[in-house]
């Protein structure tokens, strides 16, 4: 599946600073392991959308987080292999299509196209591999077979196959949650703890046997379709290898999704740890209230763009808060971002020596390399009034994706 056009990302002046990010598994900020893989690249996998509804600013903020991370790596001279999936076969998609009386494939295609447009508007660097679940069914089948062969999965009636949480000794290391919280989140976030016959309520579905009215693919263990978590396990490891630098997504994916996608890959491929970093972005609220379609308070990137808001201002509004925090979006925050952008553009005419400009860029690099500290980065640039020349402007484009 194709992604969206690449934005122009200029080279950045100054001295590279190793990127440090907060790792959910280790519960600390630590340096990203940028040891190149066999292809000389640093691997990053970010979970994509389930295309049953329009993506909103909360989704966009997550992808802006990992766009920032990739920009820091690129500015440091690393080659990045970025992979993102699309969960284009899943219950929410089928349910929404049935409710609206449309074909689930058509619904998925329409929402994927809208997402591509939003990402292009925001100058998000696209993944090299943009992979739908339907494209990767054979890869999922192979991984499910590996789990079965390893004794890490078992079959129940109706052709369903589940992976055992005790297949790896380290299950739970990624999210660091206690058992009670795992059970709560599992039930709330797509799990089926009450499924009769499961060895453990937390065992996750990796293959759903065929039901009438649902799409199905043939497999050695019967017709059916992939479970949610194993899709990402297969897509990521088939492109980035059994161990790679960063797995990312929203904070709501830490458990169960990232915990299980890591566990499935580790059990199937017999590796200790799938990703060096598990990185999670906070949620976005509108005027202090979590964005929800039922509340009618979703903010859409394409609507903001149609209303004449500069994409760079939208990025700055998101960057006003730290990526790991649950944070707010409002008309006032967007207006402040637009004022900031205007002010910076006026500063572009300021005369400053190359040495002075490079000093500002070095400070900006260091701040962003410290767990993508965008609030401090914006404060630094606000304080550089009159010090903005082309060297700094280019750094803003390369590191922040903000064009002045």
From Swiss-Prot:
Which CDD domains is this protein grouped with?
CysRS_core (cd00672)
Q: Which domain of life does the protein's organism represent?
A: Bacteria
Name one cellular component (GO) term.
Answer: cytosol
Record carries keyword ATP-binding = yes
| One Pfam family named in its UniProt record | tRNA-synt_1e
Signal peptide coordinates: none
Quote the catalytic activity from the record. Answer: 1D-myo-inositol 2-amino-2-deoxy-alpha-D-glucopyranoside + L-cysteine + ATP = 1D-myo-inositol 2-(L-cysteinylamino)-2-deoxy-alpha-D-glucopyranoside + AMP + diphosphate + H(+)
The positions annotated for binding L-cysteinyl-5'-AMP are 47-50, 62, 85-87, 228, 250-252, 284
Disulfide bonds listed in the record: none
Motif ('HIGH' region) spans which residues?
Answer: 49-59
Where Zn(2+) is bound, by residue?
47, 232, 257
Claim: Ligase is one of the keywords in the record: yes
- Cofactor needs: Zn(2+)
Q: What is its EC number?
A: 6.3.1.13
| GO MF, one annotated term | cysteine-tRNA ligase activity
- HAMAP family noted in UniProt: MshC (MF_01697)
Relate the protein's function as given in its record: Catalyzes the ATP-dependent condensation of GlcN-Ins and L-cysteine to form L-Cys-GlcN-Ins.
Family, as annotated:
Belongs to the class-I aminoacyl-tRNA synthetase family. MshC subfamily.
Its quaternary organisation is:
Monomer.
Task: Please state what the protein is called.
Answer: L-cysteine:1D-myo-inositol 2-amino-2-deoxy-alpha-D-glucopyranoside ligase 1
Gene transcribed to yield this protein = mshC1
């Amino acid at each position: 599946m194709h992604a969206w056009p690449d934005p122009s990302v200029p080279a950045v002046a100054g001295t590279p600073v190793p990127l440090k990010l907060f790792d959910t598994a280790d519960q600390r900020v630590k340096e990203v392991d940028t040891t190149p893989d066999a292809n000389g690249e640093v691997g990053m996998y970010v979970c994509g959308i389930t295309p049953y509804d329009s993506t909103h600013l909360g989704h966009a903020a997550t992808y802006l987080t990992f766009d920032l991370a990739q920009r820091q790596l690129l500015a440091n001279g690393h080659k990045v292999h970025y992979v993102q999936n699309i969960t284009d076969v899943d219950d929410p998609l089928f349910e929404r299509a049935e409710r609206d009386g449309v074909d689930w494939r058509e619904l998925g295609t329409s929402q994927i196209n809208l997402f591509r447009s939003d990402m292009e508007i925001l100058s998000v660097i696209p993944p090299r591999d943009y992979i739908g679940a339907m494209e990767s069914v054979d890869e999922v089948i192979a991984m499910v077979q590996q789990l079965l062969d390893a004794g890490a999965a078992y079959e129940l009636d109706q052709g369903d196959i589940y992976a055992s949480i005790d297949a790896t000794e380290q299950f739970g290391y990624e999210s660091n949650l206690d058992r009670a919280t795992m059970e709560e989140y599992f039930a709330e976030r797509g799990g089926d703890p009450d499924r009769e016959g499961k060895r453990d309520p937390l065992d996750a579905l990796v293959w759903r046997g065929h039901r009438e009215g649902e799409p199905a693919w043939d497999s050695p263990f019967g017709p059916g379709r992939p479970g949610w978590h194993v899709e990402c396990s297969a897509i990521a490891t088939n492109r980035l290898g059994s161990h790679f630098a960063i797995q990312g997504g929203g904070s709501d994916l830490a458990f169960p999704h990232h915990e299980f996608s890591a566990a499935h890959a580790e059990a199937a491929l017999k590796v200790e740890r799938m990703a060096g970093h598990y990185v999670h972005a906070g949620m976005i609220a509108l005027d202090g209230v979590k964005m929800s379609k039922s509340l009618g308070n979703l903010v859409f990137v394409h609507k903001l763009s149609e209303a004449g808001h500069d994409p760079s201002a939208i990025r700055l509004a998101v960057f006003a808060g730290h990526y790991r925090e649950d944070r707010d979006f409002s008309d006032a925050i967007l207006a402040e971002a637009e004022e900031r952008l205007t002010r910076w553009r006026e500063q572009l005419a300021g005369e400053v020596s190359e040495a002075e400009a490079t000093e500002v860029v070095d400070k900006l690099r260091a701040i962003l390399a410290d767990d993508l500290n965008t609030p401090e980065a914006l404060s630094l640039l606000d304080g550089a009034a009159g010090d903005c020349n082309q060297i700094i402007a280019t750094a803003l484009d390369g590191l922040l994706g903000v064009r002045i």
